[in-house]
Amino acid sequence: SSKVLVIAFSSDWLYTPSENQWVVESLQRLGKEASYLEMPDTHGHDSFLKGSDDFDRAVRVFFSGMDKKEEEEQNLGRFRQVSSRYEVKKEADFKVIDDWVSSGQRVLDLGCGRGMLLEYLRDSKQVQGLGVDFDRSKAISCIARGVSVYQQDIRHALANLPDDSFDWVIFSRMVEELPEPGAVILEALRVGRRVAVSFVNHAYWRNRLNFLGRGKRVQNEVYPDRWEKSGLRNHFSIEEFEQFCADSQVDGNAFAIGRKVFHQGDWVKHCSFMPNLRAGLAIYELIKD
């Protein structure tokens, strides 16, 4: 089927962003591959006549596909051959999620970034994917890869999706960046039959030792910035996540924890013994009852 790209301009008073969002959401409910981008502008309804680098690139890659800028991030139809410690950590959970998702399933990737996971799942398993990311540059990269994307706040995107509209909702190491992440996870369980949540375990023994010995938060490949330069972070542990799940079930939210995968501090070797202390990365499957 044909793909649709809707581009809204923030100051357009005739075809407002909210009206354009409604068009895209309606198309998505009908099972169409529809994407939404929003361009900041001050020229009202004439904004599209002025153009911008982002607008021009979005239109170009929608029709032509990958451009030189995006080729630098191209994964060549598979997970890239990673060599650095940073790259290994960046994609560690992708491989687990790939094992869990079945062919032809509907997948919603929240905080999808450049769309590499959805691109891979589309090419290898023919999934019907939709990404959500607030970053316009990353959303345009999704367009270049042929991945349907909704450039929007995650809460807004979830609120406008019907119940059980996806087989999987993916949180790939971005839950800690959300305000009130517990409520967002529960909303994802309304939209999806299964939810995959991956996160950094901040009770990992090296983190504890670093704080005990140096009295400072850790700085590494995953968190390279000092506290004053970093974004919103809700740091939590494996034990705290399982407590959230248990409390939510007591409160009447019908879901169960399915599969769990824990990686040691290198994010490669598996960890089964005392994961709250020894695991650096956790990936959970939540299943709606």
Residue positions per predicted region:
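Conserved alpha/beta-hydrolase "acid-adjacent" motif
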Residues: 14-19
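Catalytic active-site module of serine/aspartate enzymes centered on a nucleophile-bearing elbow/loop
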Residues: 35-74
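Short beta-strand/loop motif that positions the catalytic acidic residue
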Residues: 6-8
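Class I SAM-dependent methyltransferase SAM/SAH-binding core
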Residues: 116, 120-157
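Conserved alpha-helix/loop element of class I SAM-dependent methyltransferases that forms part
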Residues: 88-104
